[in-house]
Amino acid sequence: MHIAIMSRNKNLYSTSRLKEAAEARGHVIKIVDPLKCYMNINMNAPSIHVRGEELPKFDAVIPRIGASVTFYGTAVLRQFEMMGTHPLNESVAITRSRDKLRSLQLLSRKNIGLPVTGFASKPADIPDLLDMVGGAPCVIKLLEGTQGIGVVLAETRKAAESVIEAFMGLKANIMVQEYIAEAGGADIRCFVIGDKVIAAMKRQALPGEFRSNLHRGGSASIVKLTPEERSTALRAAKTMGLNVAGVDILRSKHGPLVMEVNSSPGLEGIEKATGIDVAEKIIQFIEKNVKSTSSKTKGVG
């Protein structure tokens, strides 16, 4: 097959591993920087161009779209879809999962475990908002943040009020969540492909830090999932309509709670922690599913 990988940097671990795994299985790979693409949108022969050249027809496309280029990246992916290229994850599913508030609303509708979350636009609502999530300590998150950036643990009510007021003063969209103390600064990344959790790792924050993201110095180790955790991860990915997803779960006294569903999960941490060839499993999934070029939107909302 001819497969395009949408990525801004061919040297990134995930991009290079996917290319390596696909070529090892006999496929022809082209890495396409979505920001270098421009589109001809018409009713007869829609096309994508880079530097004056029209891109050839691809059988499948693997989107590795960073959060900062979601708008343009998903526009390019939609164009691939219009041209009949099979997407690993569909543009509508990626857009859905990138909206943190919308994704939590969709998950709650499916009765999937979540931390209690509050959202408001007016400073006058802050006291009631904090009461909703159980007071301090609480977690305040920028809706546009990634990799733990824009996430604040407010340990006192006064600190929470000050941080929320500051963010609101900057016209930033934020949500406030209950702090799950029993998680102990750890979360679980479940790597979902299709209808299976093919790998899972526990990410532990550094001492004195509550964000367990590996980009923030957290450590990763292999973990055994409970049946409920496995089921929660699969249901969360399905609700978003994602074929491949990284589902982040906290272990709480109320059972597993979903923090986020990532449409472009990194491969380095999970492959090194578990020893599983995740890249090859993604390519195998494409091989089994690319026969149907009709793009069907999964999930609701």
From Swiss-Prot:
Q: What is its EC number?
A: 6.3.2.-
Output one GO MF annotation: metal ion binding
Instruction: Name all ATP-grasp domain ranges.
Output: 104-287
Cofactor: record remark: Binds 2 magnesium or manganese ions per subunit.
Positions annotated to bind Mn(2+) 2: E260, N262
Any single biological process term in GO: SOS response
Q: Where does Mg(2+) 2 bind?
A: E260, N262
SUPFAM superfamilies recorded for this chain? Answer: Glutathione synthetase ATP-binding domain-like
* Family listed: Belongs to the RimK family.
Protein name listed in UniProt: Probable alpha-L-glutamate ligase 1
Source species, please? Answer: Shewanella frigidimarina (strain NCIMB 400)
Upper taxonomic lineage = Bacteria, Pseudomonadati, Pseudomonadota, Gammaproteobacteria, Alteromonadales
